[in-house]
Amino acid sequence: MSLGLVGRKVGMTRIFTAEGDSIPVTVLDVSDNRVTQIKTVETDGYTAVQVAFGSRRASRVTKPLAGHLAKAGVEAGEILKEFRIDAAKAAELSNGAVVGADLFEVGQKVDVQGVSIGKGYAGTIKRYNFSSGRATHGNSRSHNVPGSIGMAQDPGRVFPGKRMTGHLGDVTVTVQNLEIARIDAERKLLLVKGAIPGAKGGKVFVTPAVKTKGAK
């Protein structure tokens, strides 16, 4: 249970090490993560911190949410995200506090969650990397079909989970154990080594890695 950040995917670029090695990185804008609520066991049954990211016009905020944000003294955000944390860490924060890129360190391993790019309705070749049929040699109108999807009268049905055509992408994806290559505190940017799911401008959630031995 660790505090994380909400960010916006800016895009990809590369940086160079002192040895001249090229490192592909994804740039994340994590500016203005504002604490809107601190939940405690006494009042909510668990301990967590809620943060707001981005900005939104007041006319686009519902009255209950506007009252919730006004109570915390925080400007309306584009998105609200809750992070489960320990009570000791929650006690160090207060409503209206700003959490920034300095929450992480260079070299730290993080998990990044985003929504993958939607591809629409896709066939089995694109969706599951199936092989296509022969182009010639007697093959007619069966070049990109998946083939048989079942058996005969027994069992007389298609087994659940059979890989077939369908919607591809636009699902929540978490990439684990990515390394923070660089932090630009002035511009409030995180440069994370490797690719991150989602399109440019998409929202992502960055948290300390949970499955790496010795992760900070």
UniProtKB/Swiss-Prot annotation:
GO terms for molecular function: rRNA binding; structural constituent of ribosome. One of its GO terms (biological process) is translation. The keyword Ribosomal protein applies. It holds the Pfam family Ribosomal_L3. The modification N5-methylglutamine is found at Q153. InterPro entries: Ribosomal_uL3, Ribosomal_uL3_bac/org-type, Ribosomal_uL3_CS, Transl_B-barrel_sf. Methylated by PrmB. PROSITE patterns: RIBOSOMAL_L3 (PS00474). Keywords: Methylation, Ribonucleoprotein, Ribosomal protein, RNA-binding, rRNA-binding. One of the primary rRNA binding proteins, it binds directly near the 3'-end of the 23S rRNA, where it nucleates assembly of the 50S subunit. Part of the 50S ribosomal subunit. Forms a cluster with proteins L14 and L19. Belongs to the universal ribosomal protein uL3 family. This is Large ribosomal subunit protein uL3. It comes from Burkholderia ambifaria (strain MC40-6).
